[in-house]
Amino acid sequence: MLKGRNLLDPMDFSLEELEEVFKLADEIIEEPEKFLHVCDGKILATLFYEPSTRTRFSFEAAMLRLGGQVIGFSEPNSSSVAKGESVADTIRTVGCYADIAAMRHPKEGAPAIAAMYSEIPVINAGDGSHQHPTQTLTDLLTIRSLKGDLSNLTIGCCGDLKFGRTVHSLVKALSRYKNNKFVFMSPEELKIPDYIRKEILEKNNIEYKEVSKMEDAMAELDILYMTRVQRERFFNEDDYVRLKDSYILDGEKMRYAKKDMMVLHPLPRVNEIAYEIDQDPRGCYFKQAKYGMYVRMALIAKLLGVR
């Protein structure tokens, strides 16, 4: 049972519990009308201390499609955070009004602190460059739905692997499934963090390699997970400008790829995927965004215990 639980890290749920969520998402996709009122009388609080389009909108759409309601803020200046209120006090107060909360915060660990003080389930909607577990659930559901399995895959992660919380969460999650391998493609300055390399991959004897050119790895990939270089994580604009065009996926590079490779991206896109790829059936990032709403519907229903 997931009722009353928090989701702060992709490792919080067992593989069996993840499969519970995915099976419910499958049911929602097949017969959405059956779920129109399962959250009648329930309220989701969206506490977004950082800008968001897909994550916030998909949480809100998920709750509304389940028959629930939404309260919250989309940037801290519109709340008492601007007056200096702590995360702990904010979540205690919100818990008086809402049944479940989704929090995005620029500081790593802020949702975990909120969960310590909360009487309602807390979902980490992204904390700094740390974790983004609901994006990971989105990615896993997308792969599971379109590939049929989450094992025996070669996954390429490309772009900002240092600050990319979606990549960190995805590698942690996919490392739990059998016979998955990873290829990391990034500038030297944006390499995958040591804690992922040592504590997740090497500790569990998971095969991985790092390459400097996309073309060197494209032919072996089942999944290519693209990320943008994140301007908001840089203190020096010159560094951002120098690195932002490091890896761009275009039609020429796609010639090296398998016919059934999937291109995923957590979005927003800047320039790292050429628009011509939108017409390629291997470009699955907008399907991925839709799966995000369904998996969040399933997650909310499970944590509230209404399904």
Swiss-Prot record:
HAMAP family: Asp_carb_tr (MF_00001)
Binding residue positions for carbamoyl phosphate: 54-55, 104, 132, 135, 267-268
Pathway linked to the protein: Pyrimidine metabolism; UMP biosynthesis via de novo pathway; (S)-dihydroorotate from bicarbonate: step 2/3
Protein family membership: Belongs to the aspartate/ornithine carbamoyltransferase superfamily. ATCase family.
Assembly and interaction partners: Heterododecamer (2C3:3R2) of six catalytic PyrB chains organized as two trimers (C3), and six regulatory PyrI chains organized as three dimers (R2).
Keywords: Pyrimidine biosynthesis, Transferase
Protein name: Aspartate carbamoyltransferase catalytic subunit
InterPro entries per record: Asp/Orn_carbamoyltranf_P-bd, Asp/Orn_carbamoylTrfase, Asp/Orn_carbamoylTrfase_sf, Asp_carbamoyltransf, Asp_carbamoyltransf_Asp/Orn-bd
Enzyme class: transferase
Documented EC number(s): 2.1.3.2
Binding of L-aspartate, residues: 83, 165, 228
A Pfam family annotated for this UniProt entry: OTCace
Organism: Clostridium botulinum (strain Okra / Type B1)
A GO molecular function held by the record: aspartate carbamoyltransferase activity
